[in-house]
Amino acid sequence: MASCPKAIWNWRFQRAVFRTVQLLCFSVLIFEVINQKEVSAWTYHYSNKTYSWNYSRAFCQKYYTDLVAIQNKNEIAYLNETIPYYNSYYWIGIRKINNKWTWVGTKKTLTEEAENWADNEPNNKRNNQDCVEIYIKSLSAPGKWNDEPCWKRKRALCYRASCQDMSCSKQGECIETIGNYTCSCYPGFYGPECEYVRECGEFDLPQHVHMNCSHPLGNFSFNSHCSFHCAEGYALNGPSELECLASGIWTNSPPQCVAVQCPALKSPEQGSMSCVQSAEAFQHQSSCSFSCEEGFALVGPEVVHCTALGVWTAPTPVCKALQCQDLPTSTKARVNCSHPFGDFRYQSTCSFTCDEGSFLVGASVLQCLDTGNWDAPFPECQAVTCAALPNPQNGEKTCVQPLGGSSYESTCWFTCHEGFSLSGPERLDCTPSGHWTGSPPTCEEVDTVSAPAPGVQCPTLIAPKQGTMSCQHHVRNFGLNTTCHFGCKAGFTLLGDSALQCRPSRQWTAAAPTCRAVKCAKLPVTEPIVMNCSNPWGNFSYGSTCSFHCPEGQLLNGSERTVCQENGQWSTTMPTCQAGPLTIQETLTYVGGAAAGTTGLVTGSILLALLRRRCRQKDDGKSPLNPQSHLGTYGVFTNAAFDPSP
């Protein structure tokens, strides 16, 4: 019996020894793999073995938090003091990303103030040094940084963070410090752990005010929202919604409710207004009627009422002058109009002038009468013409006539047959006065004995369309050193060189320029407005004229016509369409249509009764006819007297 307890004691002793040895072996193994230095809550760690930068970061993230993210100079001094020297040094948590040095843990770019590079670093040798090491206990640069290739093997310098998921109550930023952390509270929160919410306090609501609130963080606290509305018959005076700010102050004072009142009305220009008021001016149930002076028509309702919502039943009407016909765009005349009561309305006056080289046929001034008609027909501009030029004997004539015939801006060039020379101008232009710039030249027989050898001659130039040309000929027309200057009329710009010279190579110094019309901005057309444009020099260019109109039943708000001016600006802004009252024709159409429909139904019923009686007498077994209109649609009738379609 004595041997049994002894055996049991030996077994327990052996088991304890085995566990102790096992624990010592495990501790030795861990010590071989990892050495560490701790400071209370935030601890630093380093690997005993060397790894590449990527593997070092994986090592730190697996066993700790990440590679060291250095926040200040004190931390660098602490690391240099406590971490042991190692000849290949330590990796830290900085790497080049998108060509910028970045803290990999926070993905924040390294600022210049936080840099701690060694002298002449980073140098990026061989363009592949994208990772950073720290010189721990270096004699020449203790605690300094150096850029290195990421594949090199160094010890991993890790840290374990103090901040946890619930640190700072999830209402502030947790900032690591050596041995602890601090909380930087988000706006609206305060306290050591950001556990408190700023409160704004409750309201003292004025009479007739109703309030609805939401309190995501506590009653009448930061981020609380309150909306307000009034009892029926009252309107809100003040903000409709308030918010509790992070400062603990509401965005405004609570609103008040006042009795509903409609906006004050004014008599329309060229018209009058008469109102029946309630207890106070322009309050609920007030009504106002409107009328216009002679020569003006009311656009809008004759009577408006103030509703319980504090708005009138319709906008205030206006008195609009009678409309005259729009000016045609085919007159080719320059028009300058004054519109005291709107574009082309009563008392509008338009004066007409013609461009250089044309003359006006008709009245130079038109006025819109109170009848809605102009006081005279529209004038037109006709081009000035020059006398027809004969072909020179023993020569040829070539002409360019942009306006047709021998009109203004026509140009003719003259040449002689072989053995003859030109006596007179080589070119003639039709001037605005209706005369050519010179007399027609003649071709004279050349004296072959005394005739000089031909000199340098460049191709003949002509003035660009809508432009001018002025040449200085030194030896002969368009000969050597001839210089020609070009320009454009108002509303056009020159494309090319403004001056050309004839070179000994018989070529001009550049291609002949052209004149292009000044461009205006493209007009944005939105439904339902309709726009028609004439573009003599290209879409939305100088001289382009656009007219506007609205669908039937809608009124044009703005100018009915705009012109692209020589400065590249439109003469007026784009108009809009707004709903208008029924016209007399529309009213008659609807009333007439209804009357015609009723008459048609009565007539159809009588005819149907007669047909049924007739069919019964014949008793031929055929079905009675269904009533059909002449349009072929069952039950549809029209009144031709009021049908607006042709």
Swiss-Prot record:
Glycosylation sites: N48, N54, N80, N180, N212, N219, N336, N481, N532, N539, N557
Chain positions recorded as a carbohydrate binding sites: N123, E133, N146
InterPro entries, sorted: C-type_lectin-like, C-type_lectin-like/link_sf, C-type_lectin_CS, Compl-Cell_Adhes-Reg, CTDL_fold, EGF-like_dom, Selectin_CTLD, Selectin_superfamily
Domain EGF-like: start-end pairs: 159-195
Range of residues in the leader sequence: 1-41
Chain positions covered by the region annotation Interaction with SNX17: 637-646
Disulfide topology: C60-C158, C131-C150, C163-C174, C168-C183, C185-C194, C200-C244, C230-C257, C262-C306, C292-C319, C324-C368, C354-C381, C386-C430, C416-C443, C458-C502, C488-C515, C520-C564, C550-C577
Any one Gene Ontology cellular component term annotated for this protein: extracellular space
GO terms classed as biological process: calcium-dependent cell-cell adhesion via plasma membrane cell adhesion molecules; cell-cell adhesion; heterophilic cell-cell adhesion via plasma membrane cell adhesion molecules; leukocyte tethering or rolling; positive regulation of leukocyte tethering or rolling; response to cytokine
Domain of life the protein comes from: Eukaryota
Name of the protein in question: P-selectin
Lineage: Eukaryota, Metazoa, Chordata, Craniata, Vertebrata
